[in-house]
Amino acid sequence: MLRNHPLLSKLKRKLNSNIPRVEGIVKSTEKGFGFLEIDSKTSYFIPFKNMKKVMHGDRITALLKIDNSREIAEPEKLIEPFLTRFIGTIQVNKSIISIIPDHPFFKEKIVCSVSCILPKCVKTGDWAVAVLMQHKLIQGHYKFLAKLVKYIIKKDDVLVPWLVTLSRYQLESDCFKLNSSSIIFDNSLKREDLTHLDFITIDNSSTKDIDDALYVEKQSLGAFNLIVAISDPTSYIPFGSSLDNFALKRSFTNYLPGFTIPMLPSELSENKCSLKVNKSRPVIACKIRIDSDGCILHNYSYFFLAWIKSKATLVYECVSDWLEHKGKWVPECSNIANQLFMLNSIYNIRRNWRKNYAVLFKEHPEYNFKLSSNFQVLNVFMEMRRTAHKIVEEAMIAANICAAKVLSEKLGFGIYNVHIGFDASNSENVVRLLSKYGFNFCKDEIRTLKGFCKLRRILNKHSYKYLDNRIKKYQSFGELQFFPGPHFALGLDAYATWTSPIRKYSDMVNHRLLKSIITHTHVIKPSCDILLKINDRRKRLKMAERDLEDWLYSKFFSSIEYTKNSFNAEIIDVFRSGIRVRSLKNGANIFIPSSFLHNIRNELLCHQDQGIVYINDKKMYSVSDIIQVKLINIRTQTRNLIGKPV
């Protein structure tokens, strides 16, 4: 009788408006209940029945109510759903198709409509992409609904980790096919003929997209002329063409374990633009004068267009063995041997120059997966960069320094790799930390390139692994930008890469700018949109690489008796919930829950900001410590490795 009475409705609205409301993010638990996390210190309990209305990660507003003398959050309004586009496994029940999202906190099926072509033999466990169409917290909806938009792969296919990961981050999994007859070379530019010179390439034995070649001439007074020749794909790719737009979309060649997705069509990257032995190829070259102390003499260095012909395709391991007096391999002729000797000399003097006047980064091992022909992980092995790798790297760094200088002086813009060191707030934290170790710096000093280089040289000279780790936590991230700026991590005034145009679109952009300087032609200034696309792509590639490696590590350890052996691992991070370590043997990241560090919770403190674990106020573990770890569990659904100290 009073159901629709206006006074009663008004009273209900008033009472409802007086109930306190909070906004936060839903956090699920394995037991079914959850919490509404307001900030790092405040959260409210969400009972099991209320969790049925929301999903882990949803941003919502909730009413705060009292239930059995306990304050609880009752979900009221959805602000932003956690699930929008997602990956999951298909569930088939007669004619009904559902999907379970691939996430540790999602275990329930979501009924789906289908807007893509499914194979006739689709089975439960097959992988697909879906979008959330309906949410329970939106008024009028009583269930979650999704729509399948792309079928990925069968559940038992050997490529599941690769294709699922690529689909998750909306990355291509195929090579772009291009008819060779449609590739037209721009032959209008004048090029110097250097095909008679003894250019050599050094790369991995499996590399097909070879984009750099080197040649050295010795000068008087211990100086050298180094010519760095880089493949010129922009001579085949007009600016703004469909192929150019295709390259921009991909932005990078994606190197995943056992699975490479090129930026450019293979007809270009592995054939016409690859600096193959005894094949005449167009290049952009940089002639670099280096004095006996390793200093680049910019007044005698310049860029030009050329034709070259590689006289030898060499392999990193063979060259390293020969220069390190190991193995049986020898250069095929004295000219090639002489080139290697001179390149090694340049490496030594340039490295010494950068040690004294810039910054050398510390050597870190690389971990590589050994895969079988059907993509099973056979082993994970560690490799350190050897002499040949460092020779090529030093030559590329010198060439990129020259590019940054020329672009800055001639145009004032390009695509630069910039790293600003510390921002204002973090510089204060760094100064306080350094003072505890007896190093006196002021915050303004370490924010200058000179001061930052001084700090890095001190840390490189002394063995302060913990201090080094903490300071790196305060460093800013490197970024790409259009205008020149310092690269603190390299200790350089400016740095612009151009030496991998087959693999990086940003290098193609700098190629076009350098060519406009060389040929005195119209400069096409890159748009801001290009940087946004490249940075977004780089971010997704890094996340995909991390996720795939986690998946492959979990597959690798699942295939062996992982509980029998212990191994050395370095503590790389401390969280409130435990610590993360990295195996020194194979590079696997392993999480150790706090309960395995000490079983009395109120005696344990995991101090995330300090990177230290205290037990009864005594320091027991800190980042950079090497500890013995035993693997005890593999959480296959989340691809996480769980361990404990030995």
Curated annotation (Swiss-Prot):
What does it catalyze?
Exonucleolytic cleavage in the 3'- to 5'-direction to yield nucleoside 5'-phosphates
Q: Where is the RNB domain?
A: 191-519
The EC number on file is 3.1.13.1
- List the SMART domains hit by this protein, alphabetically: CSP, RNB
**Entry's localization field:** Cytoplasm
Kindly list the biological process annotations in GO that this record carries: mRNA catabolic process
Q: What broad class describes the main subcellular location of this protein?
A: cytoplasm
InterPro entries, per database record: CSD, NA-bd_OB-fold, RNase_B_OB_dom, RNase_II, RNase_II/R, RNase_II/R_CS, RNase_II/RNase_R, RNR_Ribonuclease
One cellular component (GO) term of this entry? cytosol
Task: Please name the GO terms that the record assigns under molecular function.
Answer: exoribonuclease II activity; RNA binding
Catalytic class of the enzyme: hydrolase
Q: Kindly list the cysteine pairs connected by disulfide bridges.
A: none
Q: Which UniProt keywords apply?
A: Cytoplasm, Exonuclease, Hydrolase, Nuclease, RNA-binding
**Stretches assigned to the S1 motif domain:** 564-646
User: Which family, according to the similarity comment?
Assistant: Belongs to the RNR ribonuclease family. RNase II subfamily.
Q: Which PANTHER family match?
A: EXORIBONUCLEASE 2, RIBONUCLEASE
Q: What function does the entry list?
A: Involved in mRNA degradation. Hydrolyzes single-stranded polyribonucleotides processively in the 3' to 5' direction.
**NCBIfam families tied to this protein:** 3_prime_RNase (TIGR00358), PRK05054.1 (NF003455), RNase_B (TIGR02062)
Q: What is this protein called?
A: Exoribonuclease 2
Source species? Buchnera aphidicola subsp. Baizongia pistaciae (strain Bp)
